[in-house]
Amino acid sequence: MSIKQHRPKVGEILECDYGQFSHTCHVDGHIPPEMVKKRLVVVLNAKLNGLILVAPISSKINLDGIKNGYHIEIDSELIKATGFYDKRTRWIKSELIQSVSRLRLYHIYDKGTKITQYLPRDVVTKVQRAIIKAINASSLLDK
């Protein structure tokens, strides 16, 4: 069940159902390389009139994303393993931030038990700085 009534906090890790690609590549569905499927996300802002700003978390390394400073590594110890999500290094993809409806967001469960997880503040700060780079506003960052 989606998080309709839950007020997520910055740094909270949830699951987002981005949906699937449209079979016809029509603009009414997702088009590659847009984000699809259910995946972990980190909450960046939950005060957007019913929308939640999130950044997706991926287990696939992208060297260009790392080199450009858009992908922030998350140590395998920061995300609890569940029956679905194994323990591995992951990356937050800051160039793929998106505002999504609460109806797309779900709590993470393991064997029927809800898991509440938050990234440390220093990791969230790295993500926020990477987003500034991704929107081509690096001049706003302290050198």
Curated annotation (Swiss-Prot):
It comes from the Bacteria. GO terms for molecular function: DNA binding. Pfam families: PemK_toxin. To E.coli YifN. This is Uncharacterized protein HI_0080. It comes from Haemophilus influenzae (strain ATCC 51907 / DSM 11121 / KW20 / Rd).
